[in-house]
């Protein structure tokens, strides 16, 4: 494969190589929401199920829709390679409160918090409609707030506040506490990015 977009294609090619060496039995024992059927892993992200053939790593959207962008496919490969099923205990954490959160807070703030604030806080009704379309659970916090089932037992909440003449729009993103041990910090950033992009695509 000729690499043109190094920022996205080089990481994908790296994890694609590791994916080819996976033992499907080890993966499905470690990540119990994933199944392996007819030579392919099946994994559900934000309500959409994808088949990823093994070992050749061909993605198929089982709903017949479009394939996710390359960073999302890389995220799914990393989920199969590195994550594990950890039960959700019912508590929530900010990104900063999780391990290495302070080190990654600057890219996280730009890619997730600021983006969520100005994408959704300026169009609260459209955000609400998109979240409902995705099957999210409405929350009583913020001007609009919703809880999303991201992948497996991992949940995320987005709360938005509409801006006015005095204050800019604002947003908070919360992670189910199992993210702290189930995902590397860079994957928590990507999870926020994926969630925002998915909601935006439905607005």
Label every PLM stretch briefly.
Residues 122-181:
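Conserved binding-pocket/active-site segment within a compact domain
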Residues 48-74, 161-186:
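Intrinsically disordered, low-complexity regulatory segments enriched in Ser/Thr/Pro
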Residues 67-88, 174-203:
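Ampiphathic alpha-helical segments that act as solvent-exposed interaction surfaces
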Residues 62, 66, 117, 144, ...:
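Short, charged/polar micro-motifs that form catalytic or ligand-binding hotspots
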Residues 27-54, 137-162:
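Amphipathic, interaction-prone secondary-structure segments
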Residues 1-39, 72, 80-134:
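Short Lys/Arg-enriched alpha/beta "domain-start" segment
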